[in-house]
Amino acid sequence: EKRPFFLEGQEIFTTSPRANPGFRSSGTPTTLINTRRIGAPPRALTDTSIELAQTEANQPSELIAATKITGQTGSLRYGLLVALEDDTELIGLKDGNTVRQTQLGRDFTAARVLYENTQGSGRNAVGLLLTEVGHQDQTAQTLGIDLHHLSQSGKLIVDVQTLHSDTAIESGHGAFADIVFRPQQGVQHKLTLDYFDRNLDISDFGFLQRNDVKGYRYRFERVQSDLKRLKGRETDLVVTQQWNFAGEQTRLGFSGAQELRFFDNTQLELKLDFYPKRWEDRNSDGNGSYRLQDRFQTAINYSSDSAKPFSYRLRANMRQEDIGGQNRSMSLALSYQPTDRLSTSFDFKYETRSGWLLHNAGSEFTRFHSESLRPKLEV
């Protein structure tokens, strides 16, 4: 989101750290409010016989008005967001003839209250968030309750949130928890728990990577500095496991990474991942699940001192494909900045894939072999 109106005062509507995962996180946001939905392309037409060009169907919706109210009374904070979209006129083809169809705009509403107790050096908070997206075709409502705890020592952080969705068709429920424990400086344990049933749908206003999932993710991080032969070292170990509600194990992975920082400000990063056999239940677009083989992935990255006028970065990656074959890539990035006003970068990537599995239609898949060379120059 880059629109100033929706960025200013948005903190009150942030219900958990997952709403903004950050640059170090590989996950996607989980949030009841994604303001980029406001002004997004209009809903699909109910008359499916009208053919729309992609540029026509994906044009943004204009806003009629939007207002935001935020404030605080003692330990109670509150916020209200309302945005109204204008109707969109779409031009398409029906039976070979040009037709015009008007799609009504949506009405977005979000109401938030948060009670915080920050006495001492810790924090305890409980919040409530209600959202509604109104449209002639369907009204979608969501409800979220969030709980937060920060111990006085700062070693324990707990964030819990429940999610509920309700439309005219179905209602869904879910919850997640993030638990962070830092027993000492430079050491962190993080456990995340997920439970999203098959009917949970918050996509009208929010964002959820997928529903029909339950599982956990454990991550160990250790940061060391001022070592005898290194300027710093970071170590990450991750274990992930997920199931769908049919009982199929849809995700299982063991990952390890280490970043070494040398005294000359160069960096070396090593990664190794192992993904045991599991079920893939999404790529077939609702046409069933299929079994993936054991797979390995490894990567090596080396970076020179980026503070110098000339710097470079080398990357090499090897990953096994879903049911056999390999993906191999090598890249080189060069950067030259003689002054603050002039900078030049050149990126070069070479990639080969064998056994690249893609879904065609129904239960049919096809494996491809590919080779690509992608140079990029920026001044």
Region locations from a protein language model:
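Surface-exposed, low-hydrophobicity segments enriched in Gly/Pro/acidic/Ser residues
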Residues: 1-242, 365-379
